[in-house]
Regions:
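Membrane-proximal, proline-rich intrinsically disordered regions
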Residues: 21-87, 94-97, 101-105, 112-116
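TPR/TPR-like alpha-solenoid repeats
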Residues: 136, 143, 227-228, 234
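Conserved, well-structured interaction surfaces
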Residues: 72-150, 154-194
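Extended ligand-binding clefts on enzyme/binding-domain cores
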Residues: 38, 239, 243-297
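Bacterial Sec-dependent N-terminal signal peptides
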Residues: 1-30
Length: 297
């Protein structure tokens, strides 16, 4: 009987030793160059880097189709029988998901790993993410209508692998709400128990406005006007109400407020060639309109 106790104690001790060895082994073999808990500010910078929606596919597909459909330009090779056929997905749509991937991770980290005042420091930063995605998604839904948005890129956080497609009407409702919330958030101090919480400084991590939250407020508020323009012929009263509310806050009204996306010092144009001559020539409707209104362009 005594021998059984000795053997049992030996086995328990061995298991504990092996378990601790495994834990130590896992710690030792963790690659120090891999970031397991990224800084939310850096995720925001990556979202900005992924934001560029006016790249090759935008010019080659989205704008190529849009300009001809709106009779702004005419194809230099003549209109083909497939002129109205969409055979590819848009650039804006693919870019919004590249941005969304970073935004969802940023939001998850702030909401689940930070608490109290430390979490509150990122309130403005989280608010900036909505207008980034909305700007790109607004272009995409103009072209293609419904798109996966509210449930997209949520699988790793317990969401679905088959997100639903939100209709344009549903998206406009959502974006109106989100943009209003963003503007109101950026227009007011963040407080806890009556004490102001200083917001996380972005500085050079913000390649658009260098951490100037006031300019981000103007950008988000101006997007509300773009949304109102899309609604004016569908629901005029609603569009005007959006404009009236937006008028309570500042908008982009000068060159210093421009959302200037400085892509790089060298690759400033469409990859594969800087010439856009093959995209089409000015249509009769456009040229005549410009002449009648003395447009010098």
């Amino acid at each position: 009987m005594k021998l059984k106790y000795i053997m049992a104690s030996f086995l328990i001790g061995s298991c504990t030793f092996i378990s601790s060895c495994k834990d130590d082994f896992a710690d030792i073999n963790t690659n120090p160059t891999i970031v397991s808990k990224p800084d939310p500010r850096y995720l925001f910078t990556q979202a900005l880097a992924n934001f560029d929606g006016h790249d090759y596919f935008a010019w080659y597909y989205d704008y190529n189709n849009m300009l001809r459909w709106s009779q702004t330009v005419a194809s230099t090779g003549g209109n083909e029988n497939l002129m109205t056929t969409m055979s590819n997905s848009g650039k804006m749509g693919s870019q919004v998901y590249n941005v969304m991937n970073q935004v969802n991770e940023l939001t998850y980290i702030v909401n689940t790993t930070l608490e109290g005042e430390e979490q509150a420091k990122y309130t403005y930063l989280k608010a900036l993410c909505q207008p980034l995605m909305i700007y790109l998604a607004m272009w995409d839904t103009d072209m293609y209508g419904s798109m996966a948005y509210t449930e997209a890129y949520q699988a790793r956080y317990g969401g679905t692998l088959t997100p639903k497609y939100d209709t344009q009407a549903e998206l406009f409702d959502l974006w109106e709400k989100q943009l209003k919330e963003t503007v109101e958030t950026l227009a007011n101090d963040v407080t806890i128990d009556g004490n102001k919480v200083t917001q996380q400084s972005l500085g050079s991590q913000d390649i658009i406005y260098q951490g100037d939250y006031t300019k981000w407020l103007k950008f988000a508020n101006s997007l509300r006007l773009k949304l109102a323009v899309r609604l004016i012929n569908e629901d005029k009263n609603r569009a005007l109400n959006i404009v009236r509310d937006a008028a309570k806050y500042p908008i982009m009204d000068g060159l210093e407020d421009d959302f200037f996306y400085n892509k790089s010092a060298t690759d400033r144009h469409m990859p594969g060639g800087n010439s856009m001559d093959n995209r089409g020539a000015g249509s009769m409707q456009l040229i005549n309109f410009m002449l009648e209104h003395f447009d010098p362009r």
